[in-house]
């Protein structure tokens, strides 16, 4: 087991089953689209932090970890921060972006439920491997797996 990085954030790849297939929840902050995530507080477990962050950023409280509690991480951001992501399902389509009491406004300006291809186009190159990992864990076809590579 590798040591915990000095700056760890935790988040959840939140998915929802729609009529046309699985949708991924993306949140927009400034010009960046990402999955819900935030810093792990001292003494807090990463999974607990991930669940807390989803609730704080979206008010979702019905997460089901159908694919277990496995996780993947991004490479280090500046200042050594690493983001750890889990996968969870929600049945809630309507998302609320509540006001953050510290900021006095919502942390995110927009949310979208998008399919795998849409998510692939919106997320940053750093987050694309997380999206691929989640899709593979869910046994969804991805361009790489569909081509046999």
Please place each PLM-identified region on the residue numbering.
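Short secondary-structure boundary/capping segments
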Residues: 4, 25, 77-78, 102-104
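N-terminal strand-loop-strand
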Residues: 1-35
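Nudix hydrolase/Nudix homology domain
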Residues: 30-33, 95-149
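The catalytic Nudix box helix
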Residues: 35-69
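Active-site-adjacent beta-strand/loop module that shapes the phosphate/pyrophosphate-binding cleft
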Residues: 8, 71-99, 112, 134-141
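Short histidine/acidic/glycine/proline-rich micro-motifs that form metal-
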Residues: 40-41, 73, 118
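Short, charged/polar surface micro-motifs in flexible loops or helix N-caps
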Residues: 19-20, 30-33, 41, 79, ...
